[in-house]
Amino acid sequence: MLTADKRDKSALIVCLSALLGATLSGCASIGSPGGGLYDEDPPVLRSSDPKDGGTNVSKQKISLHFNENVKLNNVMDKLTVSPPQEKSAVVQSNAKNVTIELQDSLRPNTTYSIDLADAVQDNNEGNPMEGLSLLFSTGDHIDSMQIAGFLLNAEDLEPVTGAYVGIYRLFEPDGSACIKDSVTAESLGDSLFMRYPFERAGKTDAYGAFKILGCAPGTYKLFALTDGNGNYKYDLTSENIAFVDTLIVPSMENRQKADTVWADSQVATARDSSALGTTERAIDTIRYSGYIDYKPTGLVLLSFNEGKRNRYLDDCSRPDSIHINVRFAAGMDSLPKLTFLAPDSLRVEGDSVLICEPNATLDTLSYWIKDSVLYCADTLLLEMTYLHTDTAGLDVPCTDTISLLKPIVRTQTNAKQDEPKKGKGRRRRKNDKADEDSVPKIVITYMELKQVYGQTLDIGKKPRFEVSAPLAECDTRKLHLQRQQDSLWIDMPLQWVPDSIHPRRFTLLADPHFNPATAYRLTADSAAMKDIYGQPLNSTTIEFKERSIDDYGHILFYIQGVTDEAFVQLLSTKDQPIQQAKVQNGQAKFVHVPTGSYFARLVVDSNRNGKFDAGNLKLHQQPEQVYYLNLKLEIRATWNYTQTWDVTATELTKQKPEEVKINKPKEKKEKVSKNEEYLRKLGKI
């Protein structure tokens, strides 16, 4: 169906245009500050070939003719052709015309839809013609039903842009099967999604909205896909998907709506004494107009990634003599097995000569080489065994042999030695000492100890420290913890606890525990620690302080609409989790919240693991439901806040606050403001 969302000029601009026309004759230059108002009207489609709704169409070239010169804006990103095409259509604009030439052969007795969204703009001001689409059929009947809705990212309700939402027709209106397949009817739709392209599809816009045009009567399975390879089917583990649990049966119905035309004058009403002196606008005419009510129109799909990314070795490097960095394309379940084959052609197991520093998902690993024979070698020959995803999608053991060269480090001394000598050199003075008689200076390098969280700690956060290299020795008797009391420093017992994952991090525990608004200091005596390369720790003193209770606010949420199987996250203004609290007895409580601005998100934690979990297509498992509080929370020190939150009171598509949305479509107010500014300069408003 040919549509164009037309915008009427506002009363203000109409009046101002008339005023300007009465005072400024000859202002005919569109968009010129000295030549008239800016053009705000989008192009108007005058004709098309084939015409909208045309049947028995046989040619592959579609022509559109507009009322003014037009241009194309990101047309290949915005164009959607259904049925989906194997070869991309060729789209061109010339003056007032746009042509779309399909490269695939037309299918018989098939309804085609061409959706250009807002890709066509006028040539002067770039006003887009929104909702431009064309429907035609190669047979004598045209299908005209529609399916519409929104696609949101499941974890953060962000609108998903540029994804395909497509359908597979499973059953005719009489219940007979449309597709004969060896799979069972229960899993038919899922199988089609992974094996065949969409039969019809729409593309999501900047708001995540989609519309699938030209649907025939019947029963459908609906999916969404961020298509990584342009084949309109789910065959890459990196692709995000969404699905609807129920089958979709589109419908359309002719309806009428009433438009009231009001009279210019007002009439007094005196139905009762309380109404005396009041006025009502008089109704002039009630006009009825017909429209087609398409259903469904408000579907909400939640996009997710199943997390089944292909595993393979992405990179292995030796940035310096003592490090080996390994990066995998996806998270791993366990560490790889490393064996050194060189130097000296000996097999040395990596566990005995390496210390691994992994990230949380085990896809990025940093190894410290602690054996001097290895880190002094110019070349390391390394054998690595790890899980690799094969062509069948299975994770199987794979062994690679990797050669790593020690990088050449160019110092200033090296550079000076490489420089050619100029002239004859200077003459040695009588009092100069010969180079061979000079005594070289002994330079001792020390390892470093620093705080992870800085000098000011939030209440309840234990102080953590990090050393510059893994430790070989640590004498806790040479570590001293003190707290400040008035002008004195009082000794305290301490525990120095190594991190179970990060080999260079330690947690400091005190007895008794750390107190708010209290200053502490940790002193390490000389040689209290020594790293695996023999570097000692110089005498070090680090001071830190825990914040005062008066630095915080507190907030209590009263949750409605979900059970206790949920948790709430306080979010920063950049949509990042700051704190998390479990919903208990309909409440989520946050204490010791630093002052500032926050937002809130709730996750229905179905498996009670304290984190968001994506869905699973084969298990028909949707991602865990997420809700946003459409409100900014301003937390002040010492204040206690309460907030009632019915998570289902607001439509899901309207829950996420605009301030934390990443995808923010540009508001179309610029040209109105330009006209107002232009007239204001002329003194007309």
Language-model features, listed with the residues they occupy:
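N-terminal targeting or signal-anchor segments and their processing/structural boundaries
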Residues: L2-I685
